[in-house]
A protein has these predicted regions:
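Short alpha-helical segments that sit at the start of domains
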Residues: 1-20
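Minor-groove-contacting beta-hairpin "wing" of winged helix-turn-helix DNA-binding domains
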Residues: 64-71
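Short, amphipathic alpha-helical interaction segments positioned at domain boundaries
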Residues: 73-82
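Short amphipathic alpha-helical interaction segments
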Residues: 2, 37-53
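A short, conserved structural fragment
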Residues: 52-62
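Short acidic, hydrophobic short linear motifs in intrinsically disordered regions
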Residues: 20-32
Length: 82
């Protein structure tokens, strides 16, 4: 089941940074903002994969091999409509 609030919080956190966020840092920021320390990795991954499929976020690997997430221009435009 989609969690639109979780998706919006992910987009808002990614919009605040220029270079993207490591996956664990993003998940921690989302947990804090939503006040949900019980957020599961599966819930988070479902939401971020949905956003990636829609072209709102992109995933890349930094030089030390960590997964980093960033927001696309389409993602920024989607946030303007909220």
């Amino acid at each position: 089941m989609r969690n639109r609030m979780l998706e919006n919080v992910i987009l808002k956190n990614l919009q605040r940074v220029e270079t993207g966020l490591r996956e664990k840092s993003l998940m921690c920021a989302v947990e804090i903002e939503m006040d949900r320390p019980d957020l599961t990795t599966a819930e988070f991954e479902d939401a971020i994969r949905y956003l990636e499929d829609k072209g709102l976020v992109n995933r890349f690997t930094n030089l030390i091999g960590e997964t980093v997430w960033g927001i696309t221009e389409m993602g920024r435009d989607a946030l303007k409509g909220l």
